[in-house]
Amino acid sequence: MIKERLDSLRELMKERGISAYLVPTADFHGSEYVGDYFKCRCFMTGFTGSAGTLVVTLDDAALWVDGRYFVQAEKQLKGSTVRMMKMGEEGVPSLEEFILAAVPEGGAAGFDGRVVDSAFGRKLERLLAGKKASIKDQEDLVDLVWKDRPAMSAQPVWILKEEYAGRSAEDKLAWLRDTMKKEGAGVHLLTLLDDIVWLLNIRGDDVRCNPVVLSYFAITNDQAFLFINPETLNQEVRDYLNDLKVEIRPYNEVYDYVKSLNNQKILLESGCVNYAMLRSIDSSNEIIDQMNPETLAKAVKNPVEIENMKKAHIKDGVAMTRFIYWLKKNIGKIPMDEISVEKKLDGLRMETEGNLGLSFDTISAYGANAAMCHYSATEESNTPLQAKGFYLVDSGGQYYEGTTDITRTIALGPLTQEEKEHYTLVLMSMLRLGAVKFPYGARGLTLDYAARQVMWDRGINFNHGTGHGVGYLLNVHERPVGIRWKMVPERMDSCVMEP
């Protein structure tokens, strides 16, 4: 099936003179998790991980994945004719190198410009120019192959009350206009979904587990435009947006709006704007390229959000405690497998007061499957739980009071000596990270070292981040917070610890 899809794509590429076609894991907004409509890479490869980039040439296909997905990709790509490229490993070409080698002098690479970030697109553009080659980005070729593609999500929009948001949308818009004025910007373009809904205090359900709304937003000193499917707005939300003096426009009209801008100073974050959007901006405009002000403001939680998040974690902790008690009481007594246990936890969480769903798909992994950082149990991989070894569960919920993310590794019975040692090392890592004191201005590199040192001393490591930011009734992974080498922690940031 995968081979047939790839061959169909290659026929379309030949007709258009394209030698290499890029299929990322992305929507039009650079979201980490995407709705079913945007799962083109999964459709073309069979790989279900949440990150990965496919490149198809006329005689080859390769998927780039990071260390979280090496084990999973190896399993899921078997028999697909798609090769795995382990990002960061010695001898593995970069995406750009692979594409450049596949495109002949005067040839062309292709992709849907709406799902490729502008930074990558411009870099590839410069590299291809050296071969007098071009980019064809006006057409979504996977759409022509995917005959039964799901419709784009259009879930109802709802208003997040100030008792939960802690700050009114009026106040946020006034603050944003003041910020624009200080930066000398006349227009600000927003394409990141979590930034938009945070700014307007609205939520939706257009991305699974992420309460966001498919939309774009533009604001000037005296106007504001929300580009959205109007069918998602009831009268209450329309009146609310009208009171905020936000004009509603159809979702796809954003490109016409951007093309109409002339001689403006436009504030945007180019790394978060798609290639097609950036190419739509007329050269008469000046771009003020910096991190979106909303991104930084959203990361620092206000006092109301902090207090509410404590309540959310207590609620979530009760559900987790009930689950762990049930698991330990019944292991070995009743049949259990990864999927049935996952459903048990999801049910306990969703019956909690104020729960609005999961914050990500639960990772329920027994034994060797727990080595896959973002493992997802399927009917084929579903493994029975036994009264021995480790069971890992990584899960979280969405509540009016906030977003949660918790991982636990549970001993179901006797352990090997190696399992005991590794568990103890991870525990030591957690304790060191939780206890470390650091001066303001210390970067994430310092904290990352504190967490990893006990493992490095024994010659082992883990191939994923040590911690990430968490949104408030938003994305479970929220930038720019994280235990990473350049990140400087701020007071009131919300960050997980997960060595």
Model-derived features with residue positions:
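Active-site neighborhoods and metal-handling regions in enzymes and metal-associated proteins
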Residues: M1-P499
